[in-house]
Amino acid sequence: MAPVRGILGLQRAVSIWKESNRLTPALRSFSTQAASTSTTPQPPPPPPPPEKTHFGGLKDEDRIFTNLYGLHDPFLKGAMKRGDWHRTKDLVLKGTDWIVNEMKKSGLRGRGGAGFPSGLKWSFMPKVSDGRPSYLVVNADESEPGTCKDREIMRHDPHKLLEGCLIAGVGMRASAAYIYIRGEYVNERLNLEKARREAYAAGLLGKNACGSGYDFEVYIHFGAGAYICGEETALLESLEGKQGKPRLKPPFPANAGLYGCPTTVTNVETVAVSPTILRRGPEWFSSFGRKNNAGTKLFCISGHVNKPCTVEEEMSIPLKELIERHCGGVRGGWDNLLAIIPGGSSVPLIPKNICEDVLMDFDALKAVQSGLGTAAVIVMDKSTDVVDAIARLSYFYKHESCGQCTPCREGTGWLWMIMERMKVGNAKLEEIDMLQEVTKQIEGHTICALGDAAAWPVQGLIRHFRPELERRIRERAERELLQAAA
């Protein structure tokens, strides 16, 4: 049986071999066809767009704020000529989800200092009402030293803010907006109130706003001049008629804000740019600036420059170019520069060597241990007593502390007292490290960010100008030694 099985196996093997030979030409022709098909020349994919490497030089047609200097009529007739309230009804009718998604795509980050993504923040508001109304609160309590951008919007382009309130309110499902204006801003309030009356008379606000079927009210509240009310929860407390002291979080305002209702607090500039973004498209807005730092921005430059100004420019513009293009350069030339505070008094200063190349956006300034903040650029030339300047800021934060948190209430006082002694060199070298330690005990240990704002300028001074502090201490010690010997 074994030979028979062997013969049968051999026959089976021969038949399989013959069958394979019969199929091989067909397989070869199929593989050849496939190969010829696969090797057919395909058009090359389009090259990726070149990565943008230079920022700045914003064209006039790309500016959102076209009446920043008050050269034109700030009220309704002039505003409509400049494009405000153009087909606002169509934007409203596109709905809440569309507005929020477009804002997310634009890459807009909050212009009040924190830089939180605006579309994401708006989306935190409840999607389904539990019976409580939702509110938009606009933080116009612009009190940061060096910051003067929002007042230009309220004074010269108030309808941009009012239209933005409606658009943002629809995006948040809010029934009303409260604009909280700094107490000292009298002219700004008068212009904004007149613009509000015009908008109501024209049917742009109130019942059936812009004929869209959406009811939206706008209220204007005058503050009393307290810096702490620029903190969002302190602002809500003040709006409710209480002392302006920050609240503990959670609950966050999006869950329990004004009068215990869902609330979003946002900056004047953030709200004012939203209608233009929706009209021109998020892709247009995100084409400016670096990734994650999109759009245009209002920069207010003051201090030792030839022409202080507030100007709208592209995000990520080099700091040096911003000053030389729009302010006529540093007083006495760039080589006369000592240091710059790039984002209002709450951020650490940066010395001249960093200012040479740094870009004006959130990420670039964070990388050099500073921040964009409100984009209030304070320029100090070599005539500045930098220690005295930071000591003066320390006094400001001591004066404006609400006193609720012990680290801030006590720490800001100690910062100011030590800085006053450092100013005249009346200290010991080891006290510089003690001063640094005091800032660390304040930073991150308070309910709101005022403690951080008080600590960071002092930390920046120690980081970049420690030799100056040491020089003053040594020189005073030498003088006292000589006086004692005499």
From Swiss-Prot:
Subunit-structure text: Complex I is composed of at least 49 different subunits. This is a component of the flavoprotein-sulfur (FP) fragment of the enzyme.
Needed co-factor(s): FMN; [4Fe-4S] cluster
Keyword Transferase: no
Function noted in UniProt: Core subunit of the mitochondrial membrane respiratory chain NADH dehydrogenase (Complex I) that is believed to belong to the minimal assembly required for catalysis. Complex I functions in the transfer of electrons from NADH to the respiratory chain. The immediate electron acceptor for the enzyme is believed to be ubiquinone.
Residues annotated for FMN binding in this entry: 222-270
Gene3D superfamilies in the record: 3.10.20.600, NADH-ubiquinone oxidoreductase 51kDa subunit, NADH-ubiquinone oxidoreductase 51kDa subunit, iron-sulphur binding domain
Recorded family membership: Belongs to the complex I 51 kDa subunit family.
Cofactor note: Binds 1 FMN. Binds 1 [4Fe-4S] cluster.
Region (Disordered): 31-57
Binding residues annotated for [4Fe-4S] cluster, in chain numbering: C402, C405, C408, C448
First-listed, main subcellular location of the protein, grouped into a coarse class: mitochondrion
Membrane topology term: Peripheral membrane protein
Species of origin: Arabidopsis thaliana (Mouse-ear cress)
Phylogenetic placement of the source organism: Eukaryota, Viridiplantae, Streptophyta, Embryophyta, Tracheophyta
GO molecular function: 4 iron, 4 sulfur cluster binding; FMN binding; metal ion binding; NAD binding; NADH dehydrogenase (ubiquinone) activity
Amino-acid positions noted as binding NADH in the UniProt annotation, renumbered to this chain: G110, R111, G112, G113, A114, G115, F116, P117, S118, G119
The organelle targeting sequence, given as a residue range: 1-30
Entry GO terms, CC: mitochondrial inner membrane; mitochondrion; plasma membrane
Catalytic activity: a ubiquinone + NADH + 5 H(+)(in) = a ubiquinol + NAD(+) + 4 H(+)(out)
Listed EC numbers: 7.1.1.2
SUPFAM superfamilies, A to Z: Nqo1 FMN-binding domain-like (SSF142019), Nqo1 middle domain-like (SSF142984), Nqo1C-terminal domain-like (SSF140490)
Sequence ranges of Low complexity compositional bias: 31-40
SMART domains, alphabetized: NADH_4Fe-4S
NCBIfam families: nuoF_fam, PRK13596.1
Biased composition (Pro residues): 41-50
Name the UniProt record assigns to this protein: NADH dehydrogenase [ubiquinone] flavoprotein 1, mitochondrial
